[in-house]
Amino acid sequence: MKYDLIIIGSGSVGAAAGYYATRAGLKVLMTDAHMPPHQQGSHHGDTRLIRHAYGEGEKYVPLVLRAQALWDELSTHNEEPIFVRSGVVNLGPADSAFLANVARSAQQWQLNVERLDATALMTRWPEIRVPDNYIGLFEADSGFLRSELAITTWLRLAREAGCAQLFNSPVSHIHHDDNGVTIETSEGCYHASKALISAGTWVKALVPELPVQPVRKVFAWFKADGRYSTKNRFPAFTGEMPNGDHYYGFPAENDELKIGKHNGGQLIQAPEERKPFAAVASDGAEAFPFLRNVLPGIGGCLHGAACTYDNSPDEDFIIDTLPGHENTLVITGLSGHGFKFAPVLGEIAADFALGKTPSFDLTPFRLSRFSQ
């Protein structure tokens, strides 16, 4: 059998692509080296932020606004919502370049973002402490996503729509010829007209020339009470420290508040190098500088987890066809800020398989930018 689209890697982007391509009427085969959702990639740990006024640059805003519409639609397929509109407050020095990008994105796209000075911040959320020179940019329409529930939902919907799924079966080789794409797996060879490579952190095992660096990252849950929950209207947050370190976190659930540090981490070259949480001496204390200064009422570390970023050299996404192979799309280099975009990236992959022109300007995400 020849498929219209084979998906190599069915985590966040791959799961979304499988659903949207199958829903569009294509014959699709989803593959993964493990059984998604799983612990080997970048999607576990229950929650991920979604921000609209984007500190990483306004080129992302059209993508994230489309993603939000798709998240809202996906949430209707579950009793438990996938998207929680908790609001997100972005904290940092008034001269922060990241916050300047947030403000610029909000102005350009007329987004609902409120600017709060330090006094107003601490009045609205007495649990938060910031220096006098800090501001907060509050996005009331943003919030967080339940990442593993999202992937489970996409996989179920794709399967119900007739998508073939081959999991716990790593792809060992990809071959291109005039008839399309062939993949080799432990279960045999499979053929398709087109392929999506969304293999996440270890994409270089299949495409060694891609400029992607795996980075071991950790996040942890700390003791918190009801003051820090959505029931008390406590928001999700990002925070920039005076030294430039960036943190992110979520409202407390079941008296546990999850927080992680976005920058830093350990460069790794193989899956076995991603040691579990607490295997690196600094893991448990990584969030202390932020908690001690900004959320001093939070208690001790309860547990944590390790994940992996697939960083590109400039930490912007890679969305492009493989050089010399126009029938193979690569989506990688999501650099620790990609999950919120998963549905729109999956939709882009489905449009690619359908032969449609993308609805977005993907020029900033081309591979050619690294050879200029």
UniProtKB/Swiss-Prot annotation:
Cofactor(s) this protein cannot do without: FAD
A Pfam family recorded for this sequence: DAO
One Gene Ontology term of the molecular function aspect: N-methyl-L-amino-acid oxidase activity
Record PTM S-8alpha-FAD cysteine, positions in chain: C307
Cofactor note: Binds 1 FAD per subunit.
Catalysed reaction, written as an equation: N(alpha)-methyl-L-tryptophan + O2 + H2O = L-tryptophan + formaldehyde + H2O2
SUPFAM superfamilies per the UniProt record, alphabetical: FAD-linked reductases, C-terminal domain, FAD/NAD(P)-binding domain
InterPro entries to which the protein is assigned, alphabetical: FAD-dep_OxRdtase, FAD/NAD-bd_sf, Me_Trp_Oxase_MTOX, MTOX
EC class name: oxidoreductase
Cellular compartments per GO CC: cytosol
EC number(s) given by UniProt: 1.5.3.-
PANTHER family with a match to the protein in the record: FAD DEPENDENT OXIDOREDUCTASE DOMAIN-CONTAINING PROTEIN, PEROXISOMAL SARCOSINE OXIDASE
Assembly and oligomerization: Monomer.
Family of the protein in this entry: Belongs to the MSOX/MTOX family. MTOX subfamily.
Protein name: N-methyl-L-tryptophan oxidase
Organism: Salmonella paratyphi B (strain ATCC BAA-1250 / SPB7)
